[in-house]
Design a protein with these regions (language model features):
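Membrane-proximal periplasmic segments of bacterial cell-envelope enzymes
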Residues: 1-308, 343-355, 361, 422
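Beta-lactam-recognizing serine transpeptidase/beta-lactamase-like catalytic domain environment
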Residues: 67, 73, 282-309, 318, ...
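A generic structural motif
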Residues: 80-81, 665-669
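Solvent-exposed, polar/charged alpha-helical surfaces in well-ordered, non-transmembrane soluble domains
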Residues: 89-97, 199, 203, 207, ...
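Structured segments of extracytoplasmic/periplasmic soluble domains
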Residues: 98-105, 204, 208-212, 234-238, ...
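Beta-lactamase-like hydrolase cores
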Residues: 321-355, 359, 374
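Gram-negative outer-membrane assembly/targeting C-terminal domains
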Residues: 689-703
Length: 703
């Protein structure tokens, strides 16, 4: 009997031991494998970390990297670890003080001012961030109408902030506590405390041993050239409109996107796909294991891992050598004009801004594009406040967004309209009488510029001579002969006032026609488009307003005998490792204006004489070049005090065009002087000559 009792006791002990072992193993499973960090006695935490994908490079047509990435470090919090530590507030307080001591900015998205009197700053945040804030209040059962000061009192109690801390100290720590809680409320990835921290500051901060603060490898956008600022573009955080668009594309709310230039235009190619990493850490923040999360199909089958995928590389049509030549030459000419010691004439000294565009005639590829004044994209963030204070708005991209009157550079368009409609025959002579008196009895009698300045005329001239000397009288007569519709149709077919197709945002400008007059002067006596308007439009005045980019398309179309190509900056897209072609851009023909060989020869020969003729308005500009150039100068009245605007268009070689160049200067006085910029570009393009000659101001050059 006693033996049986002992056996029963042993059996009971074994059963009890098995029960204890079972629950011990279950508890181990809960703590080690399945913990979510919600209990105080957990020993590990499993979190998901978004791993940012590297952005693709931007290159020029020769493979030079214009914008790339450099390796950097971010400081990221595992919020489970820091909030489970014994002295969360004190650790955060020390961390914040160290950052303030080092002058290091950190991320804090609590929409309340940092100092008293506390006020909301919701207007500074996107719709998504404002939504997260409201969700936070709801999850914490806090009235959404609560004032900022009352909310600060509420959160101070909620997070057990010591009474002896100042309101500002409390606000700083509460900002971080809010970030931690937001991760659980809104299911966000780990909180990035500091981005791109320097090695020195990283070492100083790591010495604090702040629980849960981890170092993550990352990348930062880096510009490799001080040139092309207006077209390379900038990066920035998303606003509410951006978020509405990119959320559907899988972007994280705090993703940085292209805001302007190439960065914005080619966002779809450059942006990579972020990955998701699983981190298992102990209560001290020590990493136990890390791996990328599995990707499953609709049936739950594992089909891969969610690792980051770098963005593709974009090869642009830009030629960095030509870009450098264009920007340097443009700056040289502007500074030359502004300097009384070099520019002895007063005209042009008040020059303000300028732009230049270089385009490949047969493809529409933009080889260079510059706007003056400019800025250094490498130091853009540091210099931003100073840039805003500079004269003439360096941030304004004049090549795309400034619409100017073309002046006499428009005259080839008028000639084409007259010849293609049979209103002017090859070789026909028109006598310049100085004053166009046909409508004098109606109060309209425009003058030729040489008559205005010197009381002389050009006499009997044909179309080629009229282009050479830029005779306004000749083109007044052509403008009177042709219909408004014929002139407008020709200008449109040549690309003036039309979208260029360029990937960057652009201003459309407008052509001088009946529709434009009604639009600009609705309800006034100036709303009509009369004969006088058409005659002035024929020399590039009246309401003609075009961007330098549109003028580049126009000039290329002239060179291409009426074939208008889509303007583009995109050459091709290749994979992140350069091993495969993703997309190759092909030249696109937009439209064709039928221009006969006789018409083409007439205006090309006339434009050649602008350079080579004895009276050419730019005869001194291209002196010394080995390549023949077809050009047209332009002087456009501004209707304001100061110098006239200046324009210069050309293509080369004249007999088999490869490139078209447009230079425009605000209050530059004469287009002929701007031809110096084109000359420098042509020298580099054809000769590879980086030496830019001295600026030569051409006196008495009109057009």
């Amino acid at each position: 009997m006693e033996r049986i009792s002992r056996v029963r006791a042993v059996v009971l002990l074994v059963i009890f031991g098995l029960i204890i072992s079972f629950f011990s193993m279950k508890l181990f499973s809960l703590q080690i494998i399945e913990t979510d960090g919600n209990t105080d006695n957990t020993t590990t935490f499993t979190t998901l970390t978004r791993v940012k994908a590297a952005r693709g490079d931007i290159l020029d047509r020769n493979g030079n990297i214009l914008v790339g990435n450099r390796a950097s470090y971010d400081l990221v919090f595992n919020h489970y670890v820091i909030t489970s530590s014994d002295n969360t507030n004190e650790s955060l307080y020390k961390l914040i003080k160290k950052c303030q001591e080092l002058g290091v900015a950190y991320n804090d998205h609590l929409p309340i001012t940092a100092t008293r009197p506390f006020e909301y700053t919701l207007d500074e945040y996107s719709t998504a961030w404002r939504g997260y804030f409201q969700k936070y209040l709801s999850e914490r059962s806090i009235d959404s109408d609560i004032t900022a000061p009352l909310l600060m009192e509420n959160l101070r109690d909620r997070y057990d902030i010591p009474d002896e801390w100042t309101a500002e100290e409390a606000r700083a720590v509460i900002g971080l506590r809010y970030e931690f809680d937001l991760r659980g409320v809104a299911n966000l990835s780990n909180y990035v405390f500091i981005q791109d921290v320097s090695d020195e500051n990283l070492s100083a901060i790591k010495e604090l041993n702040t629980p849960g603060l981890m170092v993550e490898s990352s990348t930062v956008r880096e510009y490799h050239t001080k040139y092309a600022a207006h077209i390379l573009g900038t990066m920035g955080a998303m606003d509410s409109d951006d978020w509405a668009k990119y959320q559907e594309l899988g972007y994280a709310m705090d993703a940085v996107i292209g805001q302007s230039g190439f960065e914005a235009a080619f966002e779809e190619y450059l942006h990579g796909t972020d990955g998701t990493r699983v981190d298992v850490v102990d209560k001290n923040g020590t990493i136990i294991s890390q791996y990328y999360a599995n990707v499953r199909d609709e049936d739950g089958n594992i089909i891969g891992v969610d690792s980051p995928k770098a963005g593709n590389n974009v090869e642009t049509t830009l030629d960095l050598n030509l870009q450098i030549a264009a920007e340097d030459a443009l700056a040289d000419v502007i500074l030359w004009l502004q300097n009384p010691e070099t520019n002895e004439e007063e005209a042009g000294r008040d020059v303000e801004g300028a732009a230049v565009v270089v385009m490949q005639v047969k493809t529409g590829e933009v080889l260079a594009c510059a706007s003056y004044p400019t800025y250094n994209p490498i130091t853009y963030n540091e210099d931003y406040d100073q840039i805003l204070e500079q004269d003439f708005n360096p941030l304004f991209n004049r090549a795309f967004h400034a619409a100017y009157p073309p002046g006499s550079s428009y005259k080839p368009c008028t000639l084409i309209a007259a010849m293609t409609t049979g209103k002017y025959e090859v070789g026909e002579i028109i006598k310049d009488e100085g004053v166009y008196r046909k409508y004098e009895d109606q109060g309209f009698a425009p003058k030729c510029l040489v008559y205005t300045n010197y009381r002389i005329t050009h006499g009997d001239i044909d179309a080629q001579k009229a282009l050479e000397v830029s005779c306004n009288y000749f083109f007044y007569e052509l403008g009177d002969r042709i219909s408004s519709q014929a002139l407008d149709d020709t200008a449109k077919a040549l690309g003036l006032g039309e979208p260029t197709g360029i990937e960057l945002d652009e201003t459309l400008g407008y052509r001088a026609n009946e529709e434009t007059k009604k639009l600009l002067y609705a309800g006034t006596i100036n709303a009509g488009f009369y004969t006088g308007n058409r005659i002035l439009a024929s020399i590039g005045q009246d309401e003609n307003r075009f961007t330098p980019m549109q003028m580049a398309v126009y000039t290329s179309t002239l060179a291409n005998q009426g074939k208008r190509m889509k303007a583009t900056f995109l050459s091709r897209v290749v994979s992140s490792d350069y091993s495969s072609l993703v997309y190759e851009n092909e030249p696109k023909l937009v439209s064709t204006l039928e221009i006969s060989d006789d018409v083409y020869k007439t205006y090309v020969e006339g434009m050649k004489q602008v350079i080579s003729g004895t009276q050419g308005t730019a005869r001194e500009t291209m002196r010394g070049l080995d390549v023949a150039v077809a050009a047209k100068t332009g002087t456009a009245q501004t209707g304001m005090q100061g110098s006239d605007h200046g324009a210069f268009i050309c293509f080369a070689p004249a007999d088999d065009p490869e490139i078209a160049i447009v230079v425009y200067g605000e209050k530059a006085a004469h287009g002929s002087t701007l031809g110096q910029v084109a000359k420098a570009i042509i020298e580099v393009y054809f000769d590879g000559d980086d030496e830019i000659g001295e600026v030569a101001y051409v006196e008495n050059a009109m057009g």
